[in-house]
Amino acid sequence: MIIPRSEHPNPQFERENWVNLNGEWEFELDRGVSGRDRKFYEREHLDSKIIVPFCPESILSGIGNTDYLNCVWYLKRVKIKKCNKRVILHFGAVDYESYIYVNHKEVYHNIGGYVGFEVDITNYVEVGKENTITVCAIDGHPNGKASGKQSENYYSIECCYTRTTGIWQTVWLEYVEKNYVKSVRYYTSIEQKSVQIEVEAQLRYSILRF
């Protein structure tokens, strides 16, 4: 199967050891937002399929359901290769509130549908074996949330496009050293003919900025 959006989502930080997780995931609607109570995160299978990173409202996802989707679930099995490195799971964006599970254990909770986030899952995976990644995405009516990806009306009035729920940007794995660079920012000055570089490094037990 051809992987959609196969390019690295952050080419400035493309490392040799990365795996694009776009493509087919298992998927299930949770209209009553009761899946966490019913422990969907312990399931080995969900009831349908979806093509990530396209949201379930999109035809490209294979679903194309434009009704109100208060909660959706995703499941993907990933084999973690044997290596003496840390394993970082990246999400380009998940709209709006998300719970991330690895091998049926909650590892991260994120609120906000516009900015990417990452999770160090090293201590939750079994190397050399198949591991389960499960995502619960909750996205009810706006109720004070930033407008843009949702509308209180079925036909998306005051919203420039169809509602967007759940994963809508690339998901990928990265294998990194115990100490690694997380991000770099550049500040340029034409007047001073200078460039300042701000580096954020993840050390084994702390984050260093310089």
What residue ranges belong to the model's regions?
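Mature N-terminal segment immediately following signal peptide/propeptide cleavage
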Residues: 16-28
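Short, solvent-exposed loop/turn elements at domain surfaces
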Residues: 28-38, 58-61
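Short Gly/aromatic-enriched secondary-structure transition segments
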Residues: 36-48
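Short beta-strand segments of immunoglobulin-like
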Residues: 184-190
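N-terminal pre-domain segments of enzymes
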Residues: 1-18
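Short flexible loop/turn segments that cap and initiate beta-strands
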Residues: 38, 137, 208-210
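Beta-strand-rich binding/interaction modules
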Residues: 102, 193-210
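Accessory beta-strand-rich segments of carbohydrate-active enzymes
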Residues: 7-12, 26-32, 64-181, 206
